[in-house]
């Protein structure tokens, strides 16, 4: 029997595209949902029957009672954060598994993150302050602590104290105090007690699901392509690989294991934090998009910067990820605009370009305007959309060279058009 392929959901803007709703909507078709990278800086908001769920580490498939949910080795895991998140749900044993190879994001990582951002002043990247960068830095520097070490909290405590002693001068500069050893040990024992039942070799779990059990597996990325450490708007990026290729390293699978790739995009664009954003609208339309779309970060609560759909960035991200189709989210937020705009090219040094240069700071958007429409909210069939909205979708398909296969017309799970 040939191995089954794993399908992949990937954000192809600056994160916050609505991946959570799509994973939740599709999860009933899958036996396993896997998260491959990032940490509790990422946030999914899912509405089911009027109830809001905020997820940061747990895969969105958790709302499907029959799905197994996996947090892979590429994730940096905050024990405190995931334990709080788990309180939203019951009977998680056997439904949630955490890689023993995932790295720990501990409280001092957040302190380092916040201290460094403060030192940068007006040159700060605008991180969430959740310690993601420092946790990944420890991983790359080969001094990180892994989730599997929680199974022996006494030994882990010794390692953390040793780490502080070896980096005493650095911590002193950042005004971070060494933890009390006894208090630290009790804290780690608490984490160990609550998380030990969920810690396992998740790579073997996924291999078995694909190779032997013929399970349907869905892979879930965090953040978005434009925040990728290599291919995003560096240095205003996250610390992990957010593209489809990153799912392989973050879960321990190979490229041949990937089947269908679905790219998630909003019908407009948003960004949290600093960094270039070519199609940002600083006027009344941008403000209106933010108000209608309730554009506040799930993790930070910060207002998101808003602008028009950037087809240049979308085409780039779709090609980079190998997207088979797009899921177009929040189409209803554009309801009522007299006209809507699409960024179809950039101007750089007086010349028109249709690609992303390494630095987006100096590009200016070139727009095409299209007639707006009255209402798409709640539509569940393509035929129910106004002609202008249908034309808008076709324009996006044409410019991005990727078909739109899913359309979301409200936050509710069922207000989704599958083409």
UniProtKB/Swiss-Prot annotation:
Mg(2+) binds at residues 16, 43. GO terms for cellular component: cytoplasm. SUPFAM superfamilies: P-loop containing nucleoside triphosphate hydrolases (SSF52540). InterPro entries: Adenylosuccin_syn_GTP-bd, Adenylosuccin_syn_Lys_AS, Adenylosuccinate_synth_dom1, Adenylosuccinate_synth_dom2, Adenylosuccinate_synth_dom3, Adenylosuccinate_synthetase, P-loop_NTPase. Its EC number is 6.3.4.4. GTP binds at residues 15-21, 43-45, 304, 330-332, 408-410. GO terms for molecular function: adenylosuccinate synthase activity; GTP binding; magnesium ion binding. It is found in: Cytoplasm. Homodimer. HAMAP family: Adenylosucc_synth. NCBIfam families: PRK01117.1, purA. This is Adenylosuccinate synthetase. It comes from Sulfurimonas denitrificans (strain ATCC 33889 / DSM 1251) (Thiomicrospira denitrificans (strain ATCC 33889 / DSM 1251)). The gene is purA.
